[in-house]
């Protein structure tokens, strides 16, 4: 899905974390070449999910929950010129399965990981449920978010095989086959009600989440085989068509990216690009109009180092090119899990180490896997893990709010690369340690993001076509700044790129 356009100009660079950029004559200058004629994927959104804390944070006092919403969604500036938030353009709404409504054994020890459900045991609907999450839906809409995804971890507990929101094991769905149509009907009813009550139509429904895992306990979830996913999507596609809703079905939110192109832990739950988008497959879904022409996967456990990052995403891109070059890829969920060459997921980190690690993942997902969307896992977290953008006290009534450098690092992308932007060519010679990507927004603005994880500064020379003079605004995230604005930067001069920080350079059309 690569197209080529002529683009006015593009730039790249990086920066001094604590000072205005300045040239250092003692270091060799690295040339950065821009080819404005080459474009790649179109960006749809940068987002996050409301699981699980928004059900509580959405009931906090107005001042506190609006502060959280501003950090996530706002495109405005404060009176002093600082940015209120990171301007997320996508929001995933967790359609709950009802484990919070159960009095019996849920196998989910943490109440904050349980969810309410609109569907009740008697088959009626209670549209007062999930009120906190619905508040954040409205907050996102009011601040300009346009892409909304309703995603499901488990079918409603009243429909499942075992009466729980997680599985007894095995690779098959925790849903009797005779309830498949009821589950599909539930998703359509929820989508219709959210549209009627909130004025928000889900752009996408994601009916299964990480189907490769067995989901025995700890949180809501269900395994699904590829055959079961295909059967569900055919039923749901038919029901959406009858309803008149324009919502599309998004698949498959794979638990790891390699499950999209190889067998993973189970051949019946792997090879999902060819399974669903190769015309030779029995599970082909490309002929169902209600199925979005995209494949979604999660970057978990494939981010150990640059070698693994690149290899996995190259294989993913190659598989798409082989099966269906027009197929989009969305990276629809990520946080730091497991041990990544000693960089572990446990232990909250509000500083730059985690921010730079994740920025490197974002860069690779965008430039190697050609991701059209990039979405973080927990927008709001109460936990001692590297899983949140905004952290809060684990309280149902209110508490402290903590922003993170990770929040602002994602903002180096999300706040400035807007829906409809094209990624454009940006190449750097002799300095692969600098992670540089460039984009052109629909309004003509050029956006360049540069990640410098090194402990050393770098000098760069930006090579642009023609003899035009370029002045830009730079936004810096470092240990001491959070999208700090630096105006009137002359891009025709060599610049000193500082260590361990992220710059976004915006060149106004």
Positions of the model-derived regions?
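Noncatalytic carbohydrate-binding groove/subsite architecture in carbohydrate-active enzymes
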Residues: 192, 222-361, 368
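Solvent-exposed beta-hairpin/edge-strand motifs
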Residues: 465-482
